[in-house]
Amino acid sequence: MSNIPQTLTIAGSDSGGGAGIQADLKTFQMQGVFGTSVITAVTAQNTLGVFDIHPIPLNTIQAQLEAVKNDFQITSAKIGMLGTADIIECVADFLKNRPFGTLVIDPVMIAKGGAPLLQQQAVSALIKHLLPLADVITPNIPEAEALTGIKISDTTSIQQTALDLQKQGAKNVIIKGGHSLNSQSQQCQDWILLQDGELFVLESPRFNTPHTHGTGCTFSACLTAELAKGAPLKSALQTAKDFITAAISHPLNIGHGHGPTNHWAYSRL
């Protein structure tokens, strides 16, 4: 049996290659783990927007999950775009017996250009069925607000939101600060609440760039890869923070809109 760490992404396909399973698999590769995938939706998108979303039939999603489970030793998995309540329930039912080790949930709700990627009625399904399975959840500020109903306006409300997500079942919570509380801030702060109650902040410089398509996918994929390699959570979080900071600060300038991050940048530092 190979000793190469094996990972799984359960997410949508991005025809533009900047987000979704494409971003996840690129990140897995760069971090030295073998990536498998379960496609939940096919999207027609590029740097300018999302033009079509086709959810994958439930039986095909189930078949993909079974195929990966029956042939690979997955030690860490991540969930990205699921899209519908039915898909959420299908995936959650399969994952309830923990076939893929540590589970990272990136609650993908809105594309970089503003297009909704999660149906409104699916939000309650995500809260009910997936949050209790999350070893780590990685919402940005708008996603955290949608999951809790709490308006984030300061550090106190961030802490309240993180605690609420834990009460809903997530063990460890990372609220990403790309959508800053202070638009003039030169720092990007991510707030982390660990299962043991420790609360701390990871900081990085903020870069004035439109090329941030797929940042959430890339961050959670790097975190998943590090956990698959056996890294402690705090170490894995720091690596993911460093990876996405490098990816954002060395843009590829591809496309005519919100371009992708640079998945090669971290390895070239």
Region spans (language model):
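Conserved N-terminal subdomain of the carbohydrate kinase-like
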Residues: S2-T9, K26-K112
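Short pre-catalytic strand/loop immediately N-terminal to key active-site residues, enriched for Gly-Thr
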Residues: I10-G16, L199-H213
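Glycine- and other small-residue-rich loops at beta-strand/loop junctions that grip anionic moieties
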Residues: S13, I79-G80, A115, T212
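Phosphate-handling active-site elements
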Residues: G32-T36, E198-F200, E226-A240
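Charged C-terminal helix
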Residues: P55, K234-L269
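Conserved phosphate/ATP/ADP-binding segment of small-molecule kinases
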Residues: Q120-L199
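Short, small-residue alpha-helix embedded
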Residues: E145-A146, T209-L233
